[in-house]
Design a protein with these regions (language model features):
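Conserved phosphate-binding loops in N-terminal lobes of ATP-dependent enzymes
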Residues: 5, 14, 25, 54-57, ...
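Glycine-rich beta-strand-to-loop/alpha-helix junction loops that act as flexible
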Residues: 60, 155-156, 184-186, 235-236, ...
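Short beta-strand-loop/turn "lid" adjacent to the catalytic site in phosphate-handling enzymes
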Residues: 19-25, 50-93, 152, 156-165, ...
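N-terminal glycine/serine-rich phosphate-binding loop of ATP-dependent small-molecule kinases
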Residues: 1-76, 122, 129-152, 165-170, ...
Length: 685
């Protein structure tokens, strides 16, 4: 079966495909104004004929960028009367208590675009006041004159009974059939009014833009006589149908980055690495995620933007920490003479100064070029020649001259600050979670990841770095290994020890039925599907929960001794203590439904024996490393010419078509039998 994975990032569009049993790759600049053009060009460069493809897997930053850039649809919000300000007020706590410049999340829809409706349910879903359909109809008729493109509907307690939302949705869609309508129960059947409202608004806000983009992508593929399926990468680490993505685009917020972490998990399993940190550095951002036993952690919530003032999203998402430091991150000097890198990025257009597209702002890639770390003749496998003079001039004018430094000193400062910022992301997923980084391995990928990984690993004492095959397009490869996945949740509150067993059984059965319906809708066979149930538990009086896997409702009833023990162990692991005498409370029941891919050739290829594909070639050049006072003469090797068992001791640079690997003095790199590079770091006593 011929399949391709296409990852559209802020700077580059990457493709990995399996065509007639062979793996092909390509990397091209993203076209911000028309992302589909990048998809078309990546297919052309990889010699992939859409007519011969059975499946396209796709990840994109379009949803999250729409939020970060605040370029979403004009959105209206319908709420229960008396609850108009839930979304605007948010939570009363200050996440950053001592930040004098703290500000709350800015709502994506204005207060005057929030409409109250007469209706009311109690917490059990029983009707207190019927929905006033005439009010909904009157509101619907006023929306076009206000330029509304999308509507979010979030009624109180609709997670327990969606009937009122369903009626409101029917009215809205009948009167304004072209308006994108999101009903909260279709996205999230879970309590927490503010987070549920925020998630619903997010889906509506990005919906029209994502729907139009995916429609354009489908049109292009059909025009090219593509007759296969399109699946989208979702934030929980699985894939979904393109139809589901158009209905639930909020699930695509981290669709590109999580694919790389899925691939890193598969590689860790192949290399028998129990605990590793996936590190992905692209052109716009750098990402890190903790991976245990081949699986990245999944959290039941996420904040888009900064933790303090971003937009809450209460959906499962792979636990990724992201910082605005990538190859295209712009370096700048503030009014006090302080040097900064990012978060603003030069993107694909105009890109770094060395691209020769007219930019005069120095970025991390320009600094790496000045330091001799990048070969200007071999960038993108020779497809783009880099302008060293333009890079040096940008660093000189914007950084070196204002700070009274040499060009090389300024470039080293840019690279050092970028590495320090990225090391914070790695710390956040290791040290901050009680994991000793000295007991982990870093798996580095992304176009710029292998160039900076060793120095970042050294800063926090990670002893080993692994650079996989095709690191520059590794996220696209990860898509080919992702399973179909859908998460379902129901709020179900009760004290462990006195639960209604029949009610718990009924909720689990409803979740299973909903899962089977979604499998059928997406054309996925139930045979081989994995139904995993979880209970969200907490000590009574706590605010947040921990998910504990359950086999059936029987684990929740009686004294539930097994469940209690599992929770205490997990609580101790997460927080360093367990209150063994405290009562437990269940809050939600969950179903995680997955179906593994039938085609495993991408995983098999990652474990295939490596053979050199090009004749041996070696050169040397001067490179400036971190903390180095002067350039160091370094070996330069071409990765496609290396053989399994080859050992290289730094200083060295290993180049390959879509990435560059920097080996610091004294560090030792070995090529595994399957072609992956293992770098063992040396540390001063």
């Amino acid at each position: 079966m011929n399949i391709v994975g296409v990852d559209i990032g802020g700077t580059f569009t990457d493709l990995v495909g399996v065509i007639d049993g062979e793996v092909v790759t390509s990397k091209t600049s993203t076209v911000p104004a028309d992302p589909t053009a990048g998809v078309a060009e990546s297919l052309r460069l990889a010699h992939c004929d859409p007519r011969r493809l059975a499946e396209v897997l796709h990840g994109s930053t379009i949803a999250i960028n729409t939020v970060l850039e605040r370029k979403g649809a004009q959105t209206a919000l319908l709420t229960t009367r008396g609850f108009r300000d839930v979304y605007g007020i948010g939570r009363s706590n200050r996440i950053e208590a001592f930040n004098l410049f703290f500000h709350r999340p800015k709502p994506l829809t204005r207060r005057e675009m929030t409409f109250e409706v007469d209706e009311r349910l109690n917490a059990a879903g029983e009707v207190i006041r019927p929905l006033d359909e005439q009010q909904v109809e009157a509101i619907a008729r006023r929306l076009p004159e206000r330029g509304v493109e999308a509507v979010a509907v979030c009624f109180l307690h609709s997670y327990a009974n969606p009937a009122h939302e369903q009626l409101a949705g029917e009215v809205l869609r009948r009167i304004n059939p072209d308006t994108f309508v999101t009903l909260s129960h279709e996205i999230l059947r879970e309590f927490r009014e503010y987070e549920r409202t925020s998630t619903t608004v997010l889906n509506a806000y990005v919906g029209p833009r994502v729907r139009d983009y995916l429609g354009t992508l489908e049109t292009y593929l059909r025009r090219e006589n593509f007759g296969g399926k399109v699946h989208m990468m979702r934030s929980n680490g699985g894939v979904m149908s393109i139809r589901k993505a158009q209905e639930e685009p909020v699930s695509m917020m981290e669709s590109g980055p999580v694919a790389g972490m899925i691939g890193a998990g598969r590689l860790a399993s192949h290399l028998r690495i129990a605990r590793c940190i996936g590190f992905d550095m692209g052109g716009t951002t750098a990402k890190a995620s903790l991976i245990t036993d081949g699986m990245p952690a999944v959290e039941e919530g996420y904040v888009i933007g900064t933790a303090a003032s971003g937009q809450p999203m209460q959906l499962p998402v792979v636990d990724i920490v992201e910082v605005g430091a990538g190859g295209g991150s712009i370096a700048w000097v503030d009014h006090t003479g302080g040097l900064h890198v990012g978060p603003k990025s030069a993107g694909a257009d105009p890109g770094p100064a060395c691209y020769g597209k007219g930019s005069s702002d120095p970025v991390v890639t320009d600094a790496d070029l000045v330091l001799g770390r990048i070969n200007p003749e071999r960038f993108l496998n020779g497809g783009m020649k880099l302008d060293v003079a333009a890079a040096r001039n940008a660093v000189h004018e914007k950084i070196a001259k204002p700070l009274g430094l040499s060009i090389e000193e300024a470039a080293l400062g840019i690279a050092t600050i970028a590495d320090s910022a990225m090391s914070l992301a790695v710390r956040a997923v290791s040290v901050n979670k009680g994991v000793d980084p000295r007991e982990t391995t870093m798996i580095a990928f992304g176009g710029a990841g292998p160039l900076h990984a060793v120095n970042i690993a050294r800063q926090i004492f990670i002893p080993r770095v692994v650079v996989p095959k095709v690191p520059g397009t590794f996220s696209a490869l990860g898509m080919l290994m992702a399973s179909w996945r859908q998460d379902f949740v129901r709020t179900f509150i009760g004290r462990i020890g006195s639960l209604d067993a029949a009610a718990a059984e009924r909720v689990l059965a409803e979740l299973a039925d909903e899962g089977r319906t979604q499998l059928k809708r997406d054309g996925v066979s139930e045979q081989g599907a994995d139904f995993r149930f979880f209970a969200d538990l907490r000590y009574i009086g706590q605010e947040h929960t921990l998910p504990i896997r359950i086999a059936d409702a029987g684990m929740l009833t009686g004294d539930a001794s097994v469940l209690r023990e599992l929770f205490h162990v997990e609580h101790d692991k997460r927080y360093g203590q367990a209150a063994l005498d405290e009562q437990l409370e269940i809050v939600n029941l969950r179903l995680v439904l997955t179906s593994a891919r039938a085609d495993t050739i991408a995983e098999e290829w990652m474990a295939q024996k490596w053979w050199p594909t090009e004749p041996a070639a070696e050169a040397s050049r001067k490179v400036i490393f971190a903390d180095a006072a002067a350039p160091v003469e370094s070996r330069v090797l071409w990765r496609p010419a290396m053989k399994p068992g080859d050992v290289v001791v730094g200083p060295a640079v290993i180049e390959e078509p879509n990435s560059t690997i920097l080996i610091h003095p004294g560090d030792r790199v070995t090529m595994t039998p399957t072609g992956h590079l293992v770098i063992d770091l040396t540390f001063e006593d």
